[in-house]
Amino acid sequence: MPQVIKFDGHYKLPAQVLDQANDKRFDHIFTNGIWGRSTGGESMSGTGSTMAYTELYRQQLSLFFNEYCTGNFTFFDAPCGDLNWITSSFQENMRYIGGDISSELIRANQQKHPEIELFQFDIATDDFPQADIWHCRHCLFHLSLADIAMALENYTNSNINVALITNHFLPDAVTLDIPTGSFRHLDLTNYPFYLPNPKLWLLDYNPVSGKNALATGVWTKDEILHGVNNYKRLWSQRAQT
C-alpha cells in the first residue's frame, strides 16, 4: 500500500490556531498577513495570486473561456482569495460569484468590491450555488486529505458539471497529509484519489527546474466522483491494515 506521511507542512501554524475550526485558521492567515508577506503588499493571498505569477494562467484561462464558454455562464470561484488577479479575467458573458471560508477576507473584499457577488463559503460543508463552473485554484494543497475528500464529495452533490482544480505533477511521490491551513505539494492523480487525467490542463506555473509544476485540471463531476470513491475505498482498506 502506498505510503502516507503525517507532515506539519511547509509552514506551521501555532498550536492554538490549529485547535480552532478551519474558518478561524484561515482568518488567522489573512489577518496576520501570513501569505501576503512575500508579495510586498500586492496580494494578501500570497505569491501565487500576484499579477506576475498569474500571467501564464490568465492567458490559459482566457483561451479556455474563448473555446468552451461561448454562451452566458456562471463561474463560481471558491476560494476566491483577495481578488487580486481574477477581476482582470472577467468576461462579458460571465456571471462571477466568489466565495471564501474566511469571513474576514470576504468582509474586506466586499468593502473593496461592493459590485461583486461575494459570500463566506466552506467548500467542504456548504451547499454550492447554481453555476456552470467551479474554479478551485491553489486551495486543496492547503487542506488535509480528509478535508479534500469532504470538499470533493460536497462538490459532487452540486449541479455544477465542470470543476477547474489546481494540481501538482508529482510522479511516484509519497502522499503527505497535513493539518488544514498548512501547505504541501499535492497530485490528485496519485494515491488516494487517483483522479483520471482530465481532457484539458491549464498551465499555471512551470518552474525552470521542471519540478513541482502546477496546472489546473478541467474535470467533470463524474470524474471527481470517481476520485471520491477511490478515496473511500482505499482509506477504508488502510484503516483495516
What are these regions (language model features)?
Residues 139:
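Hydrophobic adenine-recognition pocket in adenosine-nucleotide-binding enzymes
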